[in-house]
Amino acid sequence: MSATLGTILKQLQPDWEIRIFERLDQVALESSNPWNNAGTGHSALCELNYTPERADGSIEIASAVKVNEQFQVSRQFWAHLVDTGKLPEPSSFINATAHMSFVWGADNVDYLRRRFEALKDHPLFGGLEYSEDAEVIRGWSPLLIPGRAKSQPIAATRIAAGTDVDFGALTRHLTRYLTDNGAEFTGNARVTNVKRRKDLWRVSWRDEVGQTPHFVDARFVFVGAGGYALGLLQKSGIKEIRGFGGFPVSGEFLRTDNPEVVARHVAKVYGKASVGSPPMSVPHLDLRVVDGTPSLMFGPYAGFSPKFLKTGSVLDLFASIRWHNLVPMVAAGASNLSLVRYLLGQLAASRNTKFDALREFMPNADPADWYRITAGQRVQVIKKDAKKGGVLQFGTEVVASADGTIAGLLGASPGASTAVPIMLGLLEKCFPDRIESWKPALSAMVPSYGTLLSDDPKRADDVMTNTATSLGIAR
């Protein structure tokens, strides 16, 4: 997020001084690290939680269209940076990877069929295929069928325009571009405070080695510290952060690097979450390409840790509690008992039980091929609510001061996939007096800026074709 915002600002105001502070010795070691996330270019091509079923049996596609629109904005920005030489070879961070939805059981097959009918004619979902034929599905992803009962009803959708994104590599590329063009990067720097001083913000930090204190004054501060953004915004004292809390959820995946297994799965395949389970529980079997090497990941399996970062402290959750967010946090917990039950179930699950979840996707999976990895921490947003006292939301939220001089990002998925539209929204919120003069430059970077591609099928086709060509991915 920080690297994206910095890169956009460098295009708009090349004369502005940009400083980046990183708690670890280099960027992208936390949530952006490719093994701390699934690397899905989230565009709702296969993620079934974006297309819920209405009470009348019809399929709601508004959320799917919104997420896809957002990812198209990110694609346009990345394509612009590649075309202008600001990003290197695109295959170093993004690769064409078919996106599939796969379900079993008569009710789920019926749902997926109706979802396909609702999406297939939409301009952002062109090329979506559907099949209930085991041999067709085997051709799409050979690992899904062997060992499966022939009597089991199954269905899948597939679209070639999906992507696998190495957000760690992308973050490093963007940061390198910034430092090559005048930005100053300080690693091993633990920011300890952000305080207002008249019309400036004083950012205080200590070296992780030696604990030497430093400070710098800035006219604008963006807090893109992942799970630690909440605490730093609380320290800033802005009233807009009052009532916000965070609930950390850790994640685990199973991974295999066995080339014989990996070669038989060239897609990201998303299933359907169990009834009553939270969106984060959607199981998926993913092709990952990291540093040019393919692997497979399956998960996520949820866990609990009070840390707000993978390298954080076990005191993080308790340190985030304030008088103004205590009621929202308690209320959100009381109204999300299904999440609590889900987490307890995941914590109690044995290794064999977890592996059985993989075998629902890949019946012939061999435990000898797979090993467990721990993914990043996701701090879900808790916010005050007039009716319920507090609610837990699965998404991201920009929190900014009234005068727009400080802002931060809270939350998790879809996260990095929508970094560009989120940061463009932040610019509109924090720099309302400049946004009009920036529009020509923003439109050069993101041709659809200020419009919706879904309103203009011809323009949508042109934009997606152009970005696919620039990024070397499928249309």
Say what each PLM segment does:
Residues 10-34:
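Glycine-rich FAD pyrophosphate-binding loop
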Residues 39-139, 294-295, 307, 313-316:
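Dinucleotide-binding Rossmann-like beta1-alpha1 core, especially the glycine-rich loop
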Residues 43-45, 240-267:
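Central beta-strand plus flanking loop segment that forms part of the substrate or channel wall
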Residues 89-102, 139-181, 202, 338-342, ...:
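Helix-loop-beta segment of a Rossmann-like dinucleotide-binding subdomain
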Residues 154-220, 231, 417-431:
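Helical element adjacent to the flavin cofactor pocket in flavoenzyme catalytic cores
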Residues 62-75, 103-110, 157-177, 186-188, ...:
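Short beta-strand to alpha-helix junction loop
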Residues 223-238:
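Flavin (primarily FAD) binding-site architecture
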